[in-house]
């Protein structure tokens, strides 16, 4: 199958080389030119996911890329999503739906089946859009993963598309990364690489030029451009927790997030990280929970195991002490389930079957069931009747007296989550709460911030996507890029 000129793939020499960001930038750049473009990632491994318009889930990076294309997210944009639930295993999601969990060895054999889903999704996008902009995963030169590859060159070879190779110069060794990656590819794969992009450069480009000249002479391939290091660009991280904060002055609300082993959808906290009046702290193993106005228990892919880890670290006692001194506590999704009295996993969906005691802060019990709830929702927060939008991704069914005091009333008539009698503890299944300006402000006031400055997080994200497209215009060889996409250019 040949889609040359319609499909362009971005691969990286390493993880976090800038693949997601470059694809986002190229998508908006093409969309601004009036090109019908769609993002695509054959296989993603991440615990940050988004709910699509067709009722499935994909990686959040692809949802941001869809926004860059001015499209609603769709499951075809990320047909295979792997959500790790143990150190050696993951839940396998095909076309937005969880199909099974398996260990790494079993998944290696399953890749042939997964590839069928990948090619079917790509074919649908290629038929519907002029350009499909593809993001690879990790590095194409992982020798142990090359057999049955569906994420990098295995996919590129299957659809016969050109590849751009991006490398991060800020971490050092950029020329070794690029040349070394090429050396580890097969002849046909090496031929497929049509150029390089160097990412996160800071300094005088004239001092880099001799290295660029050497690279082109050594490889016979062009450098398509050098993107500058941008410190204040804040798009959602694909998997690693982004702890960077905007410059802040004046009084700030202290918010603490305990980082659990299987934390999921930590992009929930990006609006707080960027809020000028919030001091956000992620606390990891071996650290005590510091004094805070608000503690937020995040989502989790393995709630009972993460609850056990929370206790092992002594954080349960710290949370109770926090409440005794008047602090506020919020649980999101798995965090809500932890706040209840019992958590049951009779089918062993997240590990060994069994039950665990919760923190006992809300009169609730949760039972994990095989059917996962996936919804984009709108509603109103019980605090200040603030309007909000968010999304549900969970397998739990929660029951109990505390549900009579819901955290959110949804527009479809359902009640979501619960509040404690004294009002100091609240839990919800909804991700994305802090992205809604009014709801975020209401939650910050509830936590003790008196004069809240409203921040439009959606506008910040849109601004940064536009800035990325501007960088493409200024720093990359747009003529060559258009040619690789099969688009006319002056």
UniProtKB/Swiss-Prot annotation:
Supply the Pfam families for this chain. Answer: CbiA, GATase_3
Identify the pathway.
Cofactor biosynthesis; adenosylcobalamin biosynthesis
PROSITE patterns, A to Z: GATASE_COBBQ
Cystine connections = none
Mark the transmembrane ranges: none
Keywords (alphabetical) are:
Cobalamin biosynthesis, Glutamine amidotransferase
Stretches assigned to the GATase cobBQ-type domain: 252-439
What are the recorded Gene Ontology BP terms? cobalamin biosynthetic process
List, in alphabetical order, the Gene Ontology terms for molecular function in this entry: ABC-type vitamin B12 transporter activity; catalytic activity
Q: Does the keyword Thylakoid apply?
A: no
Taxonomic superkingdom: Bacteria
Name the InterPro entries on file: Class_I_gatase-like, CobQ/CobB/MinD/ParA_Nub-bd_dom, CobQ_GATase1, CobQ_N, CobQ_synth, GATase_3, P-loop_NTPase
Q: Which residues form the active site?
A: 333, 431
Task: Please give the CDD domains that the UniProt record associates with this protein.
Answer: CobQ_N, GATase1_CobQ
Q: Does the keyword Repeat apply?
A: no
The UniProt similarity line reads: Belongs to the CobB/CobQ family. CobQ subfamily.
NCBIfam families, per database record: cobQ, PRK00784.1
What's the name of the protein? Cobyric acid synthase
């Amino acid at each position: 199958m040949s889609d040359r000129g319609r499909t362009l793939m971005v691969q990286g020499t390493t993880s976090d080389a800038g693949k997601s960001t470059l694809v986002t930038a190229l998508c908006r750049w093409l969309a601004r030119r009036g090109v019908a473009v769609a993002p695509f990632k054959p296989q993603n491994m991440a615990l940050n996911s988004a709910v699509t318009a067709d009722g499935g889930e994909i990686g959040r990076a692809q949802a941001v890329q869809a926004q860059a294309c001015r499209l609603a997210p769709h499951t075809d944009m990320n047909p295979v999503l792997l959500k790790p639930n143990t150190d050696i295993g993951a839940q396998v999601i095909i076309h937005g739906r969880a199909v099974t969990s398996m260990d790494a060895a079993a998944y290696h054999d399953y890749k042939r089946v997964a590839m069928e889903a990948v090619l079917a999704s790509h074919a649908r996008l290629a038929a519907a859009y002029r350009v499909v902009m593809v993001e690879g995963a990790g590095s194409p030169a992982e020798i142990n993963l090359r057999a049955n590859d569906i994420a990098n060159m295995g996919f590129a070879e299957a659809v016969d598309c050109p590849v751009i190779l991006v490398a991060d110069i800020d971490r050092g060794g950029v020329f070794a990364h690029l040349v070394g990656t090429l050396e580890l590819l097969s002849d046909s794969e090496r031929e497929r690489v049509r150029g390089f992009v160097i990412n996160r450069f800071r300094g005088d480009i004239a001092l880099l030029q001799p290295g660029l000249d050497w690279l082109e002479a050594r490889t016979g391939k062009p450098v398509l451009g050098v993107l500058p290091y941008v410190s204040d660009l804040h798009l959602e991280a694909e998997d690693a927790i982004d702890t960077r904060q905007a410059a802040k002055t004046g009084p700030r609300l202290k918010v603490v997030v305990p980082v659990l082993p299987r934390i999921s959808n930590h992009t929930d906290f990006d609006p707080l990280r960027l809020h000028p009046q919030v001091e956000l702290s992620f606390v990891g193993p071996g650290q005590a929970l510091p004094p805070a106005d608000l503690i937020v228990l995040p989502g989790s892919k393995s709630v009972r195991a993460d609850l056990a880890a929370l206790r092992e670290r002594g954080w349960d006692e710290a949370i109770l002490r926090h409440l005794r001194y008047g602090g506020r506590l919020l649980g999101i999704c798995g965090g809500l389930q932890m706040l209840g009295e019992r958590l049951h996993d009779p089918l062993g969906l997240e590990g060994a079957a069994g039950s665990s005691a919760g923190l006992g802060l809300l009169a609730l019990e949760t039972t994990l069931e095989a059917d996962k709830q996936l919804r984009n929702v709108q509603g109103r927060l019980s605090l200040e009747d603030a309007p909000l939008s968010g999304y549900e991704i969970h397998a739990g069914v929660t029951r109990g007296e505390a549900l009579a005091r819901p955290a959110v009333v949804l527009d479809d008539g359902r009640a979501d989550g619960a509040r404690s009698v004294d009002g100091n503890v609240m839990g919800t299944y909804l991700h994305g709460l802090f992205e809604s300006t009014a709801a975020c402000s209401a939650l910050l006031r509830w936590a003790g911030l008196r004069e809240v400055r409203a921040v439009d997080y959606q506008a910040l994200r849109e601004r940064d996507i536009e800035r990325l497209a501007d960088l493409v215009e200024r720093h990359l060889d747009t003529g060559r890029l258009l040619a690789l996409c099969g688009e006319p250019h002056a």
